[in-house]
Design a protein with these regions (language model features):
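Extreme N-terminal regulatory/targeting segments of RNA polymerase sigma factors
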Residues: 1-142
């Protein structure tokens, strides 16, 4: 018998519309709840909208770091932002991705990086601070 989930989770996407592995993640959690991280399922569509608004309202590089850390802590999802090896002349020169993992919806993997790009377009100082935070070899400090 399936265990009750400790929190409300994201509704499943229509069949064929997403390859997130939500059902497989839930099955794995059902078999071994202590070994399976289901935090990513906490991000419902409504909460995703709130998170997108929050990301778009980021005003400083420090806020960006805080949001990245909170996403990792609360959802177990890593947001990576790396400049192109060929240089960055626009926001499109940055690679902004959510690391793929079971349960992470395709729409979320597209929507959150798009929100970060919109934030960067509205606040180019964040991009400058991001680029300045890396050393000459392009390595982010630990």
């Amino acid at each position: 018998m399936p265990q009750a989930l400790p929190f409300p989770i994201r509704k499943e996407c229509p069949p064929g519309a997403c390859e997130c592995g939500r059902d497989e993640l839930l099955d794995a959690w059902d078999k071994a709840p202590d070994d399976t991280d289901i935090r990513v399922l906490r991000l419902t569509r409504e909460q995703e909208k709130v998170l997108i608004e929050r990301i778009e309202s980021i005003a400083t590089y420090e806020e960006l770091g805080h949001i990245k850390q909170r996403i990792l802590e609360q959802l177990g999802v890593r947001l990576t932002i790396t400049p192109s090896a060929h240089g960055v002349s626009t926001v499109m020169g940055l690679s902004i991705k959510l690391v793929e993992q079971p349960g992470l919806c395709r729409r979320t993997r597209e929507n959150l990086p798009a929100a970060v790009r919109r934030c960067f377009r509205n606040n180019p100082d964040i991009v400058y601070a991001l680029l300045n935070s890396r050393d000459l070899l392009g390595i982010e400090p630990a």
